[in-house]
Amino acid sequence: MRVIWIVIGFLICINIFAEDFRIDGIRFFCRVPAKYNNHSRILVLFGGRNWPGNKTLQTYRFDAVADKHQVFLLSPSFHDRNYWEPEKWSGKTLLKAIATVERKYGLTPQKIYFYGYSAGGQCSALFYSWMPERVGAWAAHACGVYPNQPIQNAAPALITCGESDAERYQISRHFAYRYREAGGELLWKPYPETGHELSKDALKLAHAWFDAVLSEVKPVAYGEDDMLKIKPKKRIDVEYRNPLYSEKIRELWLK
């Protein structure tokens, strides 16, 4: 009986804080933070392939980070039609949804943030490349498709991937090198003995990373790829350099 009431309480909590609306036939779910003001920002959460937005919100559990920073969580229920390619149709639909939230809550347009897993990771990477001037930072887990050419001096990024997710792991690692060489700060974290699933460790790092990025803090340290060693920034070649924005991020990156 106690378990039943816990589940009911959880569902009520979700219903209180998440609303839904449709744009161009696509259902969007929006979680409103406990407090917000006209400078509140929006974090777009892209789910796995064809996930409905409410599943994404419940799986990613960014609630605490969102409330701390007064951030709106917006999740689209994209499905089919190569939706991860924003230039075809989904990009305009997302921009309409963002504008809808901004109008309803009186928000002054701010930088947008992206996070996604699997096909959602592709969305995060490709939507950023499509609208870089609007994006403050982006992150992806288990992503296998990235822009052909990284943007020069790009926004901060986080990429994580299981090492057993072999093809995506190789693609992600090499993209990380090129992104850094083009002037972007990128944190790269592989997970040994992990496949394509969205692990708890990957989500913990994503929560900590967005907490720091939304706080607009500077790195407290730098880590080197492969060796997993903390070194002075100048002693790490740029293509292997990981910015660690907080002690929590350093702890999770070294884990």
Predicted regions span which residues?
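Gly/Ser-rich "nucleophile elbow"/oxyanion-hole loop immediately N-terminal to the catalytic nucleophile
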Residues: 34-39, 83-119
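Alpha/beta-hydrolase-fold serine-hydrolase catalytic core, especially in secreted/extracellular enzymes
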Residues: 181-185, 193-255
